[in-house]
Amino acid sequence: MNSILGLIDTVTNTVGKGQQIELDKAALGQQRELALQRMSLDRQALNNQVEQFNKLLEQRVHGPIQSVRLARAAGFRVDPYSYTNQNFYDDQLNAIRLSYRNLFKN
């Protein structure tokens, strides 16, 4: 009788553990989905930051260039490189883009 009860107890424990494993797998699957969604949102946020940075950078670069053009149109002699260094801004932008790209390499 004890051996039958022991066997029933063992089977019950095994079934319970199997169910717990299945529940754990389902929970891990949900956590994985949530993590993937969070990564997607983080990637979108970083892309938005890069986009905003690009707009700011464009304003900082093209603003002085526009000023130089207006000054030239008004008859002044202007050295555009004393106002802005396009290569410096391009290099900075490329470095930032590269660092963001490296962040998401798989």
Curated annotation (Swiss-Prot):
A GO term from the CC aspect: host cell cytoplasm
Subcellular location: Virion; Host cytoplasm
Keywords: Capsid decoration protein, Capsid protein, Host cytoplasm, Virion
Record-annotated disulphide pairs: none
UniProt main location, coarse: virion
Coiled-coil residues: none
Family: Belongs to the vesivirus VP2 protein family.
Extra facts: Translated by a ribosomal termination-reinitiation process from the bicistronic mRNA coding for VP1 and VP2.
Swiss-Prot/TrEMBL domain comment: The N-terminus domain points away from the virion surface.
Subunit structure: Homooligomer. The portal-like structure consists in 12 copies of VP2. Interacts with capsid protein VP1.
Name recorded for this polypeptide: Minor capsid protein VP2
Organism: Feline calicivirus (strain Japanese F4)
